[in-house]
From Swiss-Prot:
Annotated protein name in UniProt: Putative proline iminopeptidase
GO cellular component terms, A-Z: cytoplasm
Enzyme class: hydrolase
Organism: Mycoplasma genitalium (strain ATCC 33530 / DSM 19775 / NCTC 10195 / G37)
Physiological role: Specifically catalyzes the removal of N-terminal proline residues from peptides.
Keywords linked to the UniProt accession: Aminopeptidase, Cytoplasm, Hydrolase, Protease
GO molecular function: aminopeptidase activity
Active-site residue list: 105 (nucleophile), 261, 289 (proton donor)
Length: 308
């Protein structure tokens, strides 16, 4: 019997935001909230590749300003507290008492923030490519190890920024943020494409990955929202996750992290492991940031099959 369910709809969360959500899998199975990354990437069918849809009910939501969600202003009331609140609104709408969280990269940070604020409704937490969402983590993602491994690609990104604004991470992101909000369309498009191309370069040291978004609006959303959250330091206290992770001392947290992750280097999961010794950390060899790297994908599937 086919137990898969495909439900789609829009969630009115106020603030002129209508959020697209959909479910896949077995509605009688274990509910798992899939929290996408970026910020700004949205969800698609590829997000389902980690899961057994015969035993799991996957709930997916395009965050504010992302994917198929609707708004007249992607920046308005778009912050971490609001995203966390949106997950709660969705959980209540779907009449889910408790659910498991799955998040990668930015989605891993959101999963931990949500769990810290709502531990009573969280069963287990599965993460990949941990991002702690501190200012130094944003700086590392944009201006860290990657430029040493891919100097020519990094220079192409820098060429999209006037030399007067290239002296520091702060100058770069503030220039980009100003242009994304106030620049002419030509400058905005050039800058957004350069931002996403640079990030795509860093996704995998194993498989060369290029930006596959042919719709400029999708590229623009990713660049604008990543910059928005970077400039605003994730709308979190600098060490919010590490300072509050002890709230989850009775929760099982599983993390698969690529050894060669150039966007979220290994120092971040090691910091979480130090603050939360109960963390089940699996460092995947010959893998980077991408969840599609073979060893990352195999490890994530193993963790979900074994411990979910």
């Amino acid at each position: 019997m086919n137990t898969k369910l495909n439900v789609k709809g829009y969630l009115n969360v106020g603030d002129n935001h209508q959020l697209y959500y959909w479910t896949q899998g077995n509605p009688n199975g274990k509910p798992v909230l899939y929290i996408h990354g970026g910020p700004g990437s949205g969800t698609d069918e590829g997000c389902l590749k980690y899961f057994d849809l015969e035993t799991t009910w996957i709930i997916l939501l395009d965050q504010r300003g992302c994917g198929k969600s609707k708004t007249n202003d992607i920046f308005y009331e778009n912050n971490t507290d609001k995203l966390v609140s949106d997950f709660e609104i969705l959980r209540q709408k779907l009449n889910i008492k408790n659910w498991t969280l799955f998040g990668g990269s930015w989605g891993s940070a959101l999963a931990l923030v949500y769990a810290i604020k709502h531990p009573q409704v969280v069963d287990k937490i599965f993460l990949r490519a941990l991002f702690l969402a501190r200012e130094k983590d944003w700086s590392e993602a944009l201006m860290g190890l990657g430029k040493m491994f891919y100097p020519y690609e990094h220079q192409r990104f820098m060429d999209s920024i006037p030399k007067a604004y290239q002296n520091s991470y702060e100058q770069i992101v503030n220039y980009c943020y100003d242009q994304f909000q106030n620049g002419d369309e030509s400058t905005k498009e050039k800058l957004a494409k350069a931002w996403v191309d640079w990030e795509s370069t860093l996704l995998s040291p194993i498989n060369k990955i290029h930006s596959t978004a042919t719709d400029f609006k999708l590229v623009e959303k990713l660049a604008l929202l990543e910059c928005h959250y970077a400039v605003n330091k994730s709308f979190l206290d600098e060490n919010f996750i590490l300072d509050n992770i002890s709230v989850l001392k009775n929760k099982s947290i599983y993390l698969a992290h690529g050894r060669f992750d150039l966007i979220c280097p290994l120092y971040q999961p090691l910091a979480l492991k130090q603050a939360f010794p109960e963390l089940q950390l699996y460092v995947t060899n010959n893998a980077g940031h991408s969840g599609s790297d073979a060893n990352n994908l195999a490890t994530i599937k193993h963790l979900l099959k074994t411990y979910l």
